[in-house]
Amino acid sequence: MYGILVLEDGTIIRGEGFGAETEVLGELVFNTSMTGYVEILTDPSYKGQIITMTYPLEGNYGVEKEWFESDGIKAEGFVVKDITGKELDEFLKEYNIPGISGVDTRYITRKIRSKGVIRSLLKTSTNPITKDEETELLKKVVDYPDISEIDLVPEVSTKETVIYNAEDEKTRCVLIDCGVKQSIVDCLVERGCSVVKVPYNSKKEEIISYNPDFVLVSNGPGDPENMSETVETVKNLIGMLPVTGICLGHQIITIALGGKTYKLKFGHRGGNQPVKDVESGKVYITSQNHGFATDDKIVPAGSELMHMNLNDDTVEGIRKLESSDLKNTVWSVQYHPEAGPGPHDARFLFDEMVELGIKFKAEKAN
């Protein structure tokens, strides 16, 4: 099958198509992970994006449903140097997702690194793609909006409340689902925290009705500036009970506290990002997947920098200044402590969330 990748600057990259025979538009990004292609493809944060893998060989250990981070592939397309085995090809076909192989992924990565993320079109076809078609495909790319103009979260958030009961419940969390990864839920439940997953646009009153001990705002795709409903809800929850956030949830909390976010040139996507705890000086190797960040020049008033990225000094975590009252606790991290895929250096943060919930539950009882 033929494959073609058309970039907004007019670059045409031809290769061998695999997966579904179709055509997609999206923001072209790169991921530096050496493993975890199943988790990456099924991560809802990749909605609206075509992923280029920098590691040269994909598909060499198959596909298992237990690795899924959602109910299926959420990325728009997949770009690889080489593919091996049939399972990855069949996996993409099952979810009507195109892929292209046999291309110079180093060239693509360098281009993104120097110019920034790029609007692109990926087309696969059993028929040769002509020069005349290239012109039409490029026009589609140029007309495609920037990802910040697309409201992606409604496409990946749950449509109804889902409850995950812990076997031996120690505490309860309401998770505001902006496109949550399943491993985040799993990390909480296995620690004795029951999770009530609610839609991204749930109001304060509904969230409080579940009597949670803390709230977690999840990861998800797109620009946090589009999340006005969720930001307003988080504003209303702060001061009522502890509030935490991961990735997009971190950015939403930043805005709710009065801070600002901005779009990174090419983002952080991979399992090898070093993050420093500002207070202790400890360094964690973390898994990351984001294209926006907290503006370090406008850290919310009454808050402080908690973690920073050692590659580019971007903000990786903030917290509201310490309060003796647990209900005022607010903290969030930009990276993914659950990994999925990636290192588990920061999974202790889920222990801290659960401990926070247990303490607030006891405080409420008194």
Curated annotation (Swiss-Prot):
Q: Which CDD domains match?
A: GATase1_CPSase (cd01744)
Tell me the pathway: Amino-acid biosynthesis; L-arginine biosynthesis; carbamoyl phosphate from bicarbonate: step 1/1; Pyrimidine metabolism; UMP biosynthesis via de novo pathway; (S)-dihydroorotate from bicarbonate: step 1/3
Q: Which reaction does it catalyse?
A: hydrogencarbonate + L-glutamine + 2 ATP + H2O = carbamoyl phosphate + L-glutamate + 2 ADP + phosphate + 2 H(+)
Q: Which InterPro entries match?
A: Anth_synth/Amidotransfase (IPR050472), CarbamoylP_synth_ssu (IPR006274), CarbamoylP_synth_ssu_N (IPR002474), CarbP_synth_ssu_N_sf (IPR036480), Class_I_gatase-like (IPR029062), CPSase_GATase1 (IPR035686), GATASE (IPR017926)
Q: Which domain of life is it from?
A: Archaea
Where are the annotated segments for CPSase? 1-168
User: What general EC class does the enzyme of this chain belong to?
Assistant: ligase
Q: Which residues form the active site?
A: C247, H336, E338
Q: Which UniProt keywords apply?
A: Amino-acid biosynthesis, Arginine biosynthesis, ATP-binding, Glutamine amidotransferase, Ligase, Nucleotide-binding, Pyrimidine biosynthesis
Q: Where does L-glutamine bind?
A: S45, G220, G222, L248, Q251, N289, G291, F292
Which EC number(s) does the record attach to this protein? 6.3.5.5
What SUPFAM superfamilies does the record tag this protein with? Carbamoyl phosphate synthetase, small subunit N-terminal domain (SSF52021), Class I glutamine amidotransferase-like (SSF52317)
Q: Give the molecular function GO annotations.
A: ATP binding; carbamoyl-phosphate synthase (glutamine-hydrolyzing) activity; glutaminase activity
Q: Does the keyword Membrane apply?
A: no
Where in the numbering of this chain does the Glutamine amidotransferase type-1 domain appear?
172-363
The answer on whether this UniProt entry bears the keyword Amino-acid biosynthesis reads yes
The record's listing under PANTHER family reads: CARBAMOYL-PHOSPHATE SYNTHASE SMALL CHAIN (PTHR43418:SF7), MULTIFUNCTIONAL TRYPTOPHAN BIOSYNTHESIS PROTEIN-RELATED (PTHR43418)
Provide the function of this protein. Answer: Small subunit of the glutamine-dependent carbamoyl phosphate synthetase (CPSase). CPSase catalyzes the formation of carbamoyl phosphate from the ammonia moiety of glutamine, carbonate, and phosphate donated by ATP, constituting the first step of 2 biosynthetic pathways, one leading to arginine and/or urea and the other to pyrimidine nucleotides. The small subunit (glutamine amidotransferase) binds and cleaves glutamine to supply the large subunit with the substrate ammonia.
**Similarity-based family:** Belongs to the CarA family.
| Name recorded for this polypeptide | Carbamoyl phosphate synthase small chain
The top of its lineage is: Archaea, Methanobacteriati, Methanobacteriota, Methanomada group, Methanococci
